[in-house]
Amino acid sequence: MRSLVVVGLLAACSSPADVTPDATGEVDAASDASPDAATGVPLAGFGDLAGMCGVLADPELTGASPAIVHATLTFTRRFDDPADRPLLTTGGARMMATPNAGGSSGLSEAFAYEQLARCELAPLLKTETEIVYDTTGKITDLLVSIDGHKIGVSVTRAVAYPFGQPYTLSSATTLLTRKLEDIQASTANVSAADRWQKQALAYMSWDDQSTAMLDMAWSSIDPAIKGDTILIITTTHGDDQFLYSNM
């Protein structure tokens, strides 16, 4: 286990406000915001969230170019489910209470959503099993709304096992390529009722080294595979192993 990065306990344990519905070249999202006085983001919640917050607007949400966003999430203690669900946003708590379509990634999916809810005020529209598709095939993990635009979100993790091993560029490139191709497939399959404007690929990244490999992999990916995807990398610190363990 890496050494614990101690941050304000209030940020880890205060109750968050509810989040309610309401080309060429890569888009470079706006600079770090922690917090933004105009929008009040990031919202309080479980873990100290910082980095590029409140940065997704029409150029990123509707444009034909890909974009990349970096955030950090630091935990003073591990998440205790279900006792800590009240510390999540309404959508995050709903995700924790709803089975996904299989696998062991429920916590990482919930905290990837928390980043969107706390930074971009994104209400959860549908969970993985609620999204409707026209044909059987690749699916995405959740459907959210950002500034009135439906955005599909696929979630994955950048981590090497056993914990502490370096995350290789080869591993980063292989997984990133596969996930981007899956995004194109699920976009082709989704029903008209649930059709999103575009998709985001949300990574929970084990450490700064893993994130560096992701950045290198992203820069080398064929633009045709990137498409218009928004890559969101949330690097986690502190007592975060619960996000990367099989649950």
What are these model-derived regions, one by one?
Residues 125, 152-154, 203:
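A structural signal for short, well-ordered beta-strand segments and their strand-loop junctions
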Residues 143-155:
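Active-site beta-strand-loop-beta-strand hairpin of nuclease catalytic cores
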Residues 117-145:
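A short acidic/basic microdomain associated with nuclease active sites
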Residues 156-220:
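Catalytic cores of nucleic-acid endonucleases
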Residues 1-42:
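Ser/Thr-rich, Pro/Gly/Ala-heavy low-complexity intrinsically disordered linkers and tails
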Residues 200-247:
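Domain-level recognition of nuclease-like catalytic cores that cleave nucleotide substrates
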Residues 148-151, 196-200, 227-228:
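Loop/turn elements at helix/coil->beta-strand transitions in domains of secreted/extracellular proteins
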Residues 38-118:
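Interdomain/boundary linker segments immediately adjacent to catalytic/signaling cores
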